[in-house]
Design a protein with these regions (language model features):
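Basic/aromatic-rich interaction segments and small domains that mediate binding to polyanionic partners
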Residues: 2-75
Length: 75
C-alpha cells in the first residue's frame, strides 16, 4: 500500500481546504457517485484522501493517486 509523504498531504490540504466545492472526475469504486457529481470538501486525511460530502448524499473519499476530482471555480 502506498502512503504519500507528509509534504504531499500538506500540499493537498492547502489545495483543497474544507468548504472547497469539487466535481468528481473519476472514482474506482462500485458505489461511486456518478461522474460529474458535485460536493463539498470536509477535509483531507493523513493519506491525502479528500473527504467529500457529495451532493447526492454519498461520503466516499477521493483516494489520492487513484481517484480524481476538480475544483469548481463557479457554480
Amino acid at each position: 500500500m502506498f502512503f504519500p509523504s507528509r509534504d504531499i498531504v500538506e500540499r493537498v490540504r492547502k489545495e483543497y481546504p474544507a468548504g472547497t466545492r469539487v466535481e468528481l472526475v473519476r472514482m474506482d469504486d462500485f458505489h461511486a457517485p456518478p461522474i460529474g457529481t458535485k460536493g463539498t470538501v470536509r477535509g483531507v486525511d493523513d493519506t491525502a484522501s479528500i473527504m467529500v460530502a457529495w451532493d447526492n448524499g454519498s461520503s466516499l473519499n477521493v483516494v489520492y493517486g487513484e481517484d480524481k476530482c476538480r475544483k469548481i471555480t463557479e457554480e
